[in-house]
């Protein structure tokens, strides 16, 4: 227990919540402000200016006049004129009722500030309003603009975040983001043949696909590519026979026969048959 002398700052009624203050080297007591954490409770009536001895005990419960009807288990805070009231605000809760009471009656309050405390962005004191809006996920376009000014120094990055990049901004952003010259050329839409080859080497690991993209696949690579896409092997047209549909060569041109006798005519006809057989016709 510890005691000290204090003076009543105003009329104080017993069983009301108090706060301490100092004035001219004296300690003064008065009713605790509404929605604050009280420092003590009065146990006797006092007039303004009365001198009293305050004895501080490690009390675990106070008896206080209820401002309103209170039920057992209600969390409580300071009400009007040092009375106690119900609350759901964890920031000003200092205890909970262990018995019910009607308005104007004494209620026993167990002292405890060990509650889950909910802190909202508005509780953060001098924090910038734009930051509070960001924490509450309800930023306006103006908030976003102000936050970019707070968080980002580079003008090109700001332009990117605001969705208003110029060609100059884009070029500088590419320099900020990429070190590879071929990638930069690709993003700027100005690739040379060397850039294209280097980009293909960056992007593709399969040698067959690289050969295809470089337009120089050899025969084995072509076979590999056909296998990769499920095309199988090339189709070879069979030779035409009397029973098989197939391919034939184009027969070379044959001049008109100039035969004037049967023997020469037969010779020219046989030459025609030979040309047809050479072209793949079975006769």
UniProtKB/Swiss-Prot annotation:
Its main location: virion. GO terms for cellular component: virion component. Keywords: Host-virus interaction, Late protein, Viral attachment to host cell, Virion, Virus entry into host cell. Gene3D superfamilies: 6.10.140.1630. InterPro entries: Phage_B103_Gp8. The keyword Signal does not apply. It is found in: Virion. Pfam families: Phage_head_fibr. Signal peptide: none annotated. GO terms for biological process: symbiont entry into host cell; virion attachment to host cell. Belongs to the phi29likevirus major capsid fiber protein family. Protein that forms the 55 capsid fibers. These fibers are not always present and may have been lost in some lab strains. They may enhance the attachment of the virions onto the host cell wall. Homotrimer. Forms a super helix coiled coil in the homotrimer. This is Capsid fiber protein.
């Amino acid at each position: 227990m510890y005691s000290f002398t204090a003076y009543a700052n105003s009329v104080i009624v017993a069983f009301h919540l108090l706060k301490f203050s100092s004035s001219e080297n004296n300690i003064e007591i008065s009713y605790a402000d509404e929605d604050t954490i009280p420092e003590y409770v009065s146990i006797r009536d006092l007039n303004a200016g009365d001198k009293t001895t305050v004895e501080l005990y490690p009390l675990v419960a106070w008896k206080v006049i209820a401002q309103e009807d209170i039920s057992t288990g209600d969390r409580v805070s300071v009400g009007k004129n040092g009375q106690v009231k119900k609350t759901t605000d964890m920031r000003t809760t200092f205890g909970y009722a262990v018995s019910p009471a009607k308005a104007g009656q004494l209620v026993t309050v167990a002292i405890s500030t060990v509650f889950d405390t909910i802190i909202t962005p508005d509780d953060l004191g001098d924090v910038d309003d734009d930051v509070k809006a960001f924490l509450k996920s309800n930023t306006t376009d103006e908030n976003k603009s102000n936050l970019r000014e707070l968080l980002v120094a580079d003008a090109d990055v700001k332009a990117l975040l605001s969705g208003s990049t110029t060609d100059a901004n884009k070029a500088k952003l590419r320099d900020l983001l990429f070190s590879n010259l071929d990638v930069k050329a690709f993003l700027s839409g100005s690739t040379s043949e060397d850039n294209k080859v280097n980009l293909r080497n960056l992007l593709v690991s399969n040698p067959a696909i690289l050969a295809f993209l470089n337009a120089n696949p050899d025969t084995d690579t072509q076979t590999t590519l056909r296998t990769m896409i499920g095309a199988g092997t090339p189709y070879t047209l069979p030779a035409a026979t009397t029973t098989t549909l197939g391919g034939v060569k184009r027969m070379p041109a044959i001049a008109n026969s100039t035969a004037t006798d049967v023997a020469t005519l037969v010779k020219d006809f046989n030459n025609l048959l030979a040309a047809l057989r050479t072209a793949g016709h079975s006769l």
